[in-house]
């Protein structure tokens, strides 16, 4: 396990073994800067929301689940599959076969759009991630891609929904979450805290249904 995640993994293991009842479900969050909670800070420096999405999800879920952040700012689906440098979990296929997490929240597409990943490649890669997770018994929650003022993410959002339909996975339609552009943006492409929190709340509503006893 990479250094960044060892504490989360230890916490997950400890919590899963507590209480003598059913194990607390572990939920892993995969994604780019939208999951990490990145925003542009002073002089263009990258900083982070006061309460990043995965931390907010943990607050909302309480002791009903353990949330583990597996995101990497700027990461694409292909980066996750290949396990590029600094990826918290290495190659996805190897990690998903070994992790104790039962639910995978997969939220890619923002960085793919900005970096110009061909749509067909994005769809194949996302479908591969879902297939790998489902093949080892994981439940998958796919999260759509937020709108921007330029529309660059629109086709990627449609692909996420299409992959969810094709694989029968749960899907969070982030575009149904109330937003006022550009006021709810922290910078050109990242949600400010209030919008991020509303999106996370929508994700958590799905997770509550997926993880309830």
Identify the meaning behind each predicted range.
Residues 1-16:
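Sec-dependent bacterial lipoprotein signal peptides
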Residues 38-49, 69-87, 114, 188:
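Acidic/histidine-rich helix-loop elements
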Residues 18-71, 94-98:
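Serine-esterase "nucleophile elbow" of acetyl-processing enzymes
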Residues 55, 86-213:
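Alpha-helical cap/lid subdomain in secreted, periplasmic
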Residues 14, 68, 141:
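Conserved Rossmann-like nucleotide-binding pocket used by diverse enzymes
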């Amino acid at each position: 396990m990479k250094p960044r995640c060892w504490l989360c993994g230890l916490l997950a293991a400890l919590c899963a073994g507590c209480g003598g009842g059913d194990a607390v479900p572990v939920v892993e969050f995969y994604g780019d800067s939208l999951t990490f909670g990145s925003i542009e800070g002073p002089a263009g420096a990258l900083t982070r929301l006061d309460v990043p999405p995965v931390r907010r999800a943990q607050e909302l879920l309480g002791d009903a689940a353990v949330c583990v952040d597996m995101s990497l700012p700027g990461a694409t689906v292909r980066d996750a599959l290949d396990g590029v440098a600094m990826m918290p979990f290495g190659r996805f296929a190897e990690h998903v076969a070994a992790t104790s997490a039962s639910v995978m929240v997969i939220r890619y597409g923002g960085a793919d759009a900005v970096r110009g990943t061909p749509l067909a490649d994005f769809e194949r890669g996302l479908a591969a991630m879902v297939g790998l997770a489902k093949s080892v018994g994981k439940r998958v929650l796919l999260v759509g891609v937020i709108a921007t003022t330029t529309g660059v993410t629109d086709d990627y959002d449609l692909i996420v929904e299409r992959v969810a339909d094709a694989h029968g996975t749960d899907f969070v339609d982030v575009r149904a979450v109330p937003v006022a552009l550009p006021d709810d943006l922290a910078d050109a492409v990242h949600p400010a805290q209030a919008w991020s929190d509303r999106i996370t709340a929508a994700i958590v509503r799905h997770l509550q249904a997926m993880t309830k006893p």
